[in-house]
Design a protein with these regions (language model features):
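Non-transmembrane "mature" sequence context
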Residues: 1-139
Length: 139
């Protein structure tokens, strides 16, 4: 039986999200690594300690990082399906998303999408905002 991508992601998170993923996101978005650490809810001290010991992020931080990546992938898929291919060639999706996650949204009770990454219900609420944006509805 072939494993589904969801199972592969589950296994990857269970194995532990490497600290390098934080640096990868920082490079892709242009955000300082400290901002990405803040999204994950991991202190600089913990990050540096885990990085030096070649240990993964703490479980909760790893789940938040994966939620961030999942939301970014959802947005990319939505734009690939319905966006203008010419505009997409020059659109800085990662940079736009990095700014957007820090904007307070009325649809989220004036919380930021970054705040909502703290638990699965908040993550679903952000996914719903993205889906409504795609449909052209007021989020």
């Amino acid at each position: 039986m072939r494993e589904a991508p969801g199972v592969q992601l589950y296994d990857a998170v269970e194995a532990g999200v490497p600290t390098d993923v934080v640096k990868m996101i920082a490079r892709a978005t242009g955000e300082p690594a400290s901002v990405i650490m803040g999204l994950a809810g991991v202190s600089q001290t913990t990050f540096v300690r885990n990085e030096a010991a070649n240990k993964p992020l703490p479980d909760v931080a790893g789940h938040r990082i994966m939620a961030y990546l999942r939301l970014l992938a959802t947005l990319r898929r939505m734009l690939d399906e319905s966006g203008d291919p010419e505009q997409m060639k020059t659109f800085d999706l990662e940079g736009w998303f990095a700014r957007w996650v820090h904007e307070k949204l009325p649809e989220l009770g004036d919380k930021t999408p970054a705040d909502m990454l703290r638990n699965p219900e908040g993550q679903r609420a952000v996914e719903q905002v993205l889906e409504r944006m795609r449909g052209g509805l007021a989020a």
